[in-house]
Amino acid sequence: MARTTAINRYRNIGICAHVDAGKTTTTERILFYTGLSHKMGEVHDGAATTDWMVQEQERGITITSAAVTTFWKGSRGQYDNYRVNVIDTPGHVDFTIEVERSLRVLDGAVVVFCGTSGVEPQSETVWRQANKYGVPRVVYVNKMDRAGANFLRVVGQIKNRLGHTPVPVQLAIGSEDNFQGQVDLIKMKAIYWNDDDKGTTYREEEIPADMVELANEWRNNMVEAAAEATEELMNKYLEEGELSVEEIKAGLRARTLASEIVPAVCGSSFKNKGVPLVLDAVIDFLPAPTEIPAIKGIHPDLIDVPKDEVKPEQFDERHADDDEPFSALAFKIATDPFVGTLTFVRVYSGFLTSGDSVINSVKGKKERVGRMVQMHANQREEIKEVRAGDIAALIGMKDVTTGDTLCNADKPIILERMDFPEPVISLSVEPKTKQDQEKMGIALGKLAQEDPSFRVKTDEETGQTIISGMGELHLDILVDRMKREFNVEANIGKPQVSYREKITKSNVEIEGKFVRQSGGRGQFGHCWVRFSEPDVDDKGNITEGLVFSNEVVGGVIPKEYIPAIQKGIEEQMKNGVVAGYPLIGLKAAVFDGSYHDVDSNEMAFKIAASMATKQLAQKGGGVVLEPIMKVEVVTPEDYLGDVMGDLNRRRGLVQGMDESVSGRVVRAEVPLGEMFGYATDVRSMSQGRASYSMEFSKYAEAPSNIVEALVKKQG
């Protein structure tokens, strides 16, 4: 089957923004104008097509990135048919993992700002992530009908706060209740939208007299920006003082793809004024899959080599071409009530037909592709093949998680792995009834497969199920999904910190002896173990787990009991020696002991080793470690004092400060135990203008007052 749309007419784009900039409404309008969706969904009614989870509709926020395939021929039918794959991304800080995951597979982005509130903290986070992946973007200033909306003010904020060069290609005609349309600076015409067809068509008129001067000024700014693309255009502009419409578009496009500028448009999605021109801007200024750098990857043999040690010549490249070997990245897993697991993939090279077998090169497993569907929000269309540049969902994948690569078995490659941050907050969840117990296990397993930043484990001592994630809202929503999608009722505990323990002395020799001999068959286990603190590398990372060695000579302990001694030490490590938290690492050598011909058995030696390990609290200088987070707070200068004072109160150590376009960036290391509720506190301290990000840095010794409280709690 031949390709239906040429690859240079593909646009893989994301709609990115902070909460409430009107991103979902904008996506809805895109679906409407591209002819797929006949009734516009409104977020207020909880009916938007891309917000397809019940929680999203209730909270009016977007959680999952739904990928939607649409087609666009231009607001005036001026193009051949373009295929636009739209990925809707969430805007809440706890879901930055979703945004990051989407940006990874996009070629370009439309960043939506609110005409009234402009650049907000979360938009700075999204902007930084887009910079990290080098995503070219177009800015759409939405909600121009709102009180206090001002297009040029937001353009100024993008320049000053985000440090990018926005180039308006439109101006707003009127604002607030009087917002009527746009001035198209490329054609130098005024555009007014028809309400009868919900803003599908528009009429062009002359620019209002009171705007001509402003329009000329901003047009010159735009033409100059376009002329700087090449020497040729610059020379023509200097000689003739003007460029043709085609030259302006070509110049702006080249500079947008190089991430030197961002074209800016405006409108009101809710009032149906302007979205078709946003789509035109996507076609005019954002890249096709063939215009972005080839994706790099490594051979599966190099999977264990640290990223920074892979030599440049060891990287493999895949170009967006049907003739190259097949490669695709799984960027999202979703559970669908009707078909089971959907694996969303972005195809980078080659093609795949349903029924083909591929390998998951990260896990080294073979997968057979059953059915393939292309999603239109929550409806789906079955397709027979996917080609380079496509985004589709595969059904029937057995063991694929987010970030895995699917490829040809004879040309394996691992595309760049996404870095998922370690979860920092944990809660205990307990099923309310026996029936819920089994369902909860299945539900948590599925949710963990969908979301790599969410982990599940069982606390061996209490038997409780512990879930960990990226923030309080993140876990709230997962618990909520468990209730709704899987009908599991659960009781939720308070947020907990994951503490660890370690010893601080080396070459400590401890005897463990377990004897029970009171008639009949007894128990006898006796060992001497030399314990040492774990090794630490030059970056301060502790060697985790047990490093065990057997130095017994002369058969004083028979060989078959040595594994039991190792097991006894490992089990006691899990339960800790000071306050009941796992030992992070330990070196142990068994070097002496004795046994009894009749009474010795594996169990006795296991208990003896465990008893020896328990004594480490006193004899080995046992300490409790707490997780230390690397915290970055971006705050306007006015609130710097408050933010610094607050970090000190939280036992934070300020590591340094930088200037940034968004204000001051404070870098600090703060114990996680002091960071609960910080999202709310930092917002109220700075009237919502400061934003922060936090990731795990290291484990460090906890102060004595914390340790005392923990020991007391363990009783």
Curated annotation (Swiss-Prot):
Subcellular location: Cytoplasm
Predominant subcellular localization, coarse grouping: cytoplasm
Gene Ontology biological process: ribosome disassembly
Keywords: Cytoplasm, Elongation factor, GTP-binding, Nucleotide-binding, Protein biosynthesis
UniProt KW Cytoplasm keyword: yes
UniProt GO cellular component terms: cytoplasm
Highest taxon listed in the record's lineage: Bacteria
Single Gene Ontology MF annotation: translation elongation factor activity
Domain tr-type G residue range list: 8-290
Annotated residues for binding of GTP: 17-24, 88-92, 142-145
Similarity comment text for this entry: Belongs to the TRAFAC class translation factor GTPase superfamily. Classic translation factor GTPase family. EF-G/EF-2 subfamily.
Job of this protein: Catalyzes the GTP-dependent ribosomal translocation step during translation elongation. During this step, the ribosome changes from the pre-translocational (PRE) to the post-translocational (POST) state as the newly formed A-site-bound peptidyl-tRNA and P-site-bound deacylated tRNA move to the P and E sites, respectively. Catalyzes the coordinated movement of the two tRNA molecules, the mRNA and conformational changes in the ribosome.
Record protein name field: Elongation factor G 1
Organism from which the protein derives: Pseudomonas putida (strain ATCC 47054 / DSM 6125 / CFBP 8728 / NCIMB 11950 / KT2440)
Gene that encodes the chain: fusA
